[in-house]
Amino acid sequence: ITAMAEPMVSHDCVAFYLLSQEVSKSVTVVQSGQGADEVFAGYSWYPPLAKVPREQGPAEYAKVFTDRPHAELARILEPDWLLDDDPSRAFIRDHFATPGAETTLDAALRLDSTIMLVDDPVKRVDNMTMAWGLEARVPFLDHELVELAAACPPELKLAHGGKGVLKEVARGNVPDGVIDRPKGYFPVPAIRHLEGAFLDRVRDAVTDPVAKARGLVRNDWLEAMLADPNTARTNLGSNALWQVALLEMWLQERGI
């Protein structure tokens, strides 16, 4: 949490932090594969978006990428902290309205590669690696490569289960077993299922007098979460209590 420039609730922060700690013992610079999925359409949710009419794009994109609907935030936040409008939906709608992306998939890839990617996963990995003096470079985000990929027809990127054109270029240069293996993630079970000492730390943070004085979260919601910390999940499958706890821990760490 100390290494985070801003609150980062993704489970993989812990994994990247520990991995960077180990890798930094022998090297100072690593190459990261970040950006390949966003630039070359590697994620599983891109093929369904390719079938969505352009005018329906913002609503369908929001279903995939909006972790907490505005209505749910109204059940979590105290009224003084809740905005009347839905800034997430407005942001997506405005971006999709920008000219230059002919299809829903093109608009989604543009948003992901120019905004979501650099403001979330790239920033996460940069924070976790630099905490150990490790520099992570991102060759898939070379601007000329990104521009070339943006001009590539969507069907070529979606081929072969995603990142099709990239896989074809790599074939013969990279072992097939690497190219065709199932996609891997960095799961952190302790953050998905809160119990024991870790749950105690979460409870201490959200019930701290500083948190109560802040008055960010509704007491009824918080009490329900602490009574049953592992049932409630966000749209994207994260532990709902952990996200609130991480925010509170980060604020307390910064003396805010």
Give the predicted meaning of each segment.
Residues V27-Y43:
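Short acidic/histidine-rich active-site segments
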Residues I1, Y43-S44, A190-H193:
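Short secondary-structure transition/capping segments
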Residues Y17, Q21, E168:
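Active-site phosphate/pyrophosphate- and oxyanion-stabilizing loops and adjacent acidic/basic residues
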Residues I1-L18, W45-E55, A151-L156:
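ATP-dependent adenylate-handling ligase core
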Residues V39-F65:
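A mobile, often basic/glycine-rich helix-loop segment
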Residues K25, V29, P58-I256:
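Adenosyl-5′-phosphate
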